C-alpha cells in the first residue's frame, strides 16, 4: 500500500486495505518450523482465479526479502523497481526479455534466473535503477513462452 516504516497509517492498515477492496486473512503456519521468524506467505488470486504464492521475510528496519515464488526459491529485496517474469525455461526467452528492456532504455541493475527444473517453469527477476515503463509488461507478455509478468514499482 506504499506506506513507509514511520507512516502513521500503518496502525489502520487493515481497515484501509478493506476500504480499498483488498480481501485478506491470517492463517498461522503450524507445519513449517524452520523458517525465519518474521516470514509471511501471501497467496494472491486475480479476477481469473489465477494463483501465485509469494514468501517474504521482514528483516527489520523496513527491509524485506522475497525468498520464494510458488515452490521456487528466489532472492530479491524490492529495493529497486522489479520485473518478475514467469516463463518457460527455454533458450531465447531471457534474450527476448532483455531486448524488450533495452528497446525501452531500461538499465538492468541486477538480473537473476530461477527455475523449477530444466525445461520447466522459470522466473526471471530483473531489478532496475529507475522506474519501469508502463507498457513493458504488455511487451514481454507478447512472447508465447511468457505466462505472466508482474512489476513492483518504487
Region spans (language model):
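Short beta-strand scaffold segments in enzyme catalytic cores
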Residues: 40-43
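A conserved regulatory-domain signal marking ACT and ACT-like small-molecule sensing domains
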Residues: 1, 7-14, 18, 24-29, ...
